[in-house]
Amino acid sequence: NFLSSYDIHGEGLYQPKFMEIERKNVINSAGNMINVFGLTYLRGRGEIDSGQFNDFKIISYTGGACTFASKDTIKKIGNVDPIFFAYHDDVDYGWRGWLLEIPSYYESKSIVYHYGSPTLNWSSKKFFLLERNRWICLLTLYSRTTLLKIFPLLLIVEIGMLGFFIEKRMLVMKIKSFFSIIKLLRKIDKRKKKIDKSRILSDKKIIINFVDDFPLPISTTNLKTSQKVNSVITSLSKLSRKLINY
């Protein structure tokens, strides 16, 4: 099915439908999405598969557990960057693809059964890596102009997320992620310069393939909190999108 899709749609990164390996009728991911603030989620995660995601769709990025691409595509984008340990290496790879006009696709006809973060689960180490690596993506993949435009709203999101980290007793990990970014600033700057030289698409074009919402996994909070957070982030994201496009 990947080969058939490639014959039709051409160059790109292709993701299958990920299903849980222990509950084979439950979706793990029907396409991975990036929020304008670099927050990510898996479309359809935790839902019973009744064919609601049996589509072919342009997505923000493909899951690292299984991505299909041609040799030429991989050569253009380059290797996975080792600066991303365990998390967001796939986010970065898909984003870098978009910078080079290489899209990401979800092909539901291909199915892979996947454990899904069995090592760290929702541990403090995972939160640390997710936050640190999210900021590496933001600082290196957005242009400086875009970062300046959305910085005030990014700051609001960060302050809001502090409450979540305090609730989950992971504030220390959040603070550690900031200090880790500071330690990596030289590498981040070098990486950004390299990416800026090769990028083809502007951020205005890139964010067309990003989303505004961010539904927190119910496994980490309750439904009411998830809906409230999603509403606030969606509003801020839409405003950021307007600023980027201005």
Task: Describe each PLM feature range.
Residues 206-229:
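An extracytoplasmic/periplasmic, membrane-proximal ligand-sensing/linker region
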Residues 100-208, 230:
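Active-site-adjacent helix/loop segment of glycosyltransferases
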Residues 60-111:
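A short, conserved alpha-helix in the catalytic core of glycosyltransferases
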Residues 27, 36-41, 47-72, 91, ...:
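A recurrent flexible, glycine/aromatic-enriched loop bordering the glycosyltransferase active site
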